[in-house]
Every structure is written in structure tokens, then in C-alpha cells.
């Protein structure tokens, strides 16, 4: 039985790639300066446009996917007797996962045998994208839905996500980081390195003076535990630093490929300009 893989716009996957690999994308929305912007489809807002507005003083807000949007997609699949695997944006960072659970319950009232599996990835951006790529590879190699789900869920505890943010104000403003942590990042070029812990929370793990030293520390953190030879590097604005980070990672003997994946508008709204991120699968749980 074939099945659909779906994920959010927060996975930051290239939309052409997603279409080519039969991945359904469902989008969060962004409110900025009184306008509502889509993050999926031909009229989606670009990260560059949003970041320019943020540099000019705009404070965008993001909205989770509502129950009705999920219900529409789930009901269509149930009506056509097609199974669906949805890889959800972290439940710690958004209410989107809960909306999906509620929508599934509604659909199963009419279609009790509907096959709708929902995974809380506890991830965002390239991490969520990484898991979706693994799911697509598993499905395309002949794995069924439950086998694919098991593969993804086995990787989630070992997925390591590192963020280097130029200004923690945006994370604090959006409620993704405490005011105390954000204050530390505002002191005299101190650059906190953050990661997503085992509970899915975004927390500081190191405080480094200067951006270049912080990038080297990010590489050092990645080198501590590598299981998969593919690494994803994401960025906002500063592609040059991202390329340098890629080169440093490729110098490691256990890394054979580094995929470059620009951060999408939803994540950009929360981290701001000049952010770098690395996503890697380790041997051990976080």
C-alpha cells in the first residue's frame, strides 16, 4: 500500500524537490506589518524579503497550522483510502502537532479505519527536513508506512541541532528562549551556541566571544558524535559564513557530504539575520 509523506514548511525543504519526491508540504503563516503571508505555494513569502523587513524594524509573528487545514488534508486521504505519514514540527516549539492530533480524531469519527500516522519530530528547519528526507528514502526503497515511521522515530533521539544566532532578541520575543539567556547573548559580542535538547527545548550550551570562535565551537560540537556522514548546514543572510562552515565540516574524516539548506521564513522570523545552524545524526541519544 503506497502512502503519502507530509511535513510542514518549517522543514525548509526546497518545494521543487518536495514535489519531485511526492512530499506534501503544509504551511504555517506569518503576520508582519498587518499582512498575512503564506509559506507554501507560488505566493509564499521569501526569507530574504522577511529578513529585510526585520532589519528595518518589523517584528513578524508566526501562526501554527489550524485544525481545519489538517482536517481537510486528512479527510481527503481517508476518503480516497490512502495512508498518510505526517512528520510534525516540534510540539515544544509550536501547537501545530496538537492541531494535527485533533484533526485526526475528527476524521476518524467518520473514517475509523483511516491510516494517519503523526510523528512529533521534536525538530525544526534542517532537522525536520533531514528526517523527511530519510522517510522519503525509506519509502522509495520499499519500506511500508509503519516501517518508515519506525526508522524516523529511531533517529529522532540522535538528531543533533545546533544554532548560532547573531541576536537572541528575536528568540526571546517569540517566547522560544528565556529573557535571562537572551540577556547573556547581548553582552559585548558574546555568541551563545544553542542546541535542541532531549525534550525538544532550545537551550544554550556554550557562550563564546566572537563569531569566528563560535563557529569553530559549533564544528567541535558536531565532531563529538557523528553517525551519518551527511550533515546539513542552514543559514540566514550570511551565506559566506555558511560556506566556510561547510568547508570546515568537510575536512572531518567522518563527514562526506554537507547539504546547504537556507532557513525558511518561519524559522527566520524567530532567529533573525546572520544565523547559522547545523544538523547531524549522532551515534548516541541527546
From Swiss-Prot:
Pfam families: DegV (PF02645). Gene3D superfamilies: 3.30.1180.10, degv family protein, Dihydroxyacetone kinase, domain 1. One of its GO terms (molecular function) is lipid binding. Keywords: Lipid-binding. Hexadecanoate binds at residues 62, 94. Residues 3-282 form the DegV domain. SUPFAM superfamilies: DAK1/DegV-like. The keyword Protein biosynthesis does not apply. NCBIfam families: DegV (TIGR00762). May bind long-chain fatty acids, such as palmitate, and may play a role in lipid transport or fatty acid metabolism. This is DegV domain-containing protein SPy_1936/M5005_Spy1650. It comes from Streptococcus pyogenes serotype M1.
Amino acid at each position: 500500500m503506497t502512502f503519502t509523506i507530509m511535513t510542514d514548511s518549517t522543514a525548509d525543504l526546497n518545494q521543487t524537490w518536495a514535489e519531485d519526491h511526492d512530499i506534501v508540504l503544509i504551511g504555517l503563516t506569518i503576520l508582519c506589518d498587518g499582512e498575512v503571508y503564506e509559506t507554501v505555494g507560488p505566493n509564499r513569502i521569501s526569507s530574504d524579503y522577511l529578513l529585510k523587513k526585520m532589519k528595518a524594524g518589523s517584528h513578524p509573528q508566526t501562526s501554527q497550522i489550524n485544525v481545519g487545514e489538517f482536517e481537510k488534508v486528512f479527510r481527503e486521504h481517508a476518503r480516497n483510502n490512502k495512508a498518510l505519514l505526517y512528520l510534525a514540527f516540534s510540539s515544544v516549539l509550536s501547537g501545530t502537532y496538537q492541531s494535527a492530533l485533533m484533526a485526526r480524531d475528527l476524521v476518524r469519527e467518520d473514517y475509523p479505519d483511516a491510516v494517519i500516522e503523526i510523528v512529533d519530530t521534536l525538530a525544526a528547519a534542517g532537522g525536520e527536513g533531514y528526517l523527511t528526507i530519510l522517510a522519503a528514502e525509506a519509502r522509495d526503497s520499499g519500506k511500508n508506512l509503519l516501517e518508515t515511521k519506525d526508522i524516523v522515530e529511531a533517529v529522532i533521539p540522535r538528531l543533533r541541532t545546533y544554532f548560532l544566532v547573531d541576536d537572541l532578541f528575536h528568540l526571546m520575543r517569540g517566547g522560544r528562549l528565556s529573557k535571562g539567556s537572551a540577556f547573556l547573548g547581548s553582552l559585548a559580542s558574546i555568541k551563545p551556541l544553542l542546541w535542541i535538547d532531549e525534550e525538544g527545548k532550545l537551550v544554550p550550551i556554550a557562550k563564546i566571544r566572537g563569531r569566528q570562535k563560535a563557529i569553530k565551537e559549533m564544528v567541535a560540537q558536531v565532531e563529538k558524535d557523528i553517525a551519518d556522514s551527511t550533515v546539513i548546514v542552514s543559514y540566514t543572510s550570511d551565506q559566506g559564513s555558511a560556506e566556510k562552515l561547510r568547508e570546515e565540516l568537510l575536512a572531518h574524516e567522518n563527514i562526506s557530504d554537507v547539504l546547504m539548506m537556507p532557513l525558511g521564513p518561519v524559522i527566520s522570523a524567530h532567529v533573525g539575520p546572520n544565523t547559522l545552524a547545523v544538523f547531524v545524526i549522532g551515534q548516541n541519544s541527546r
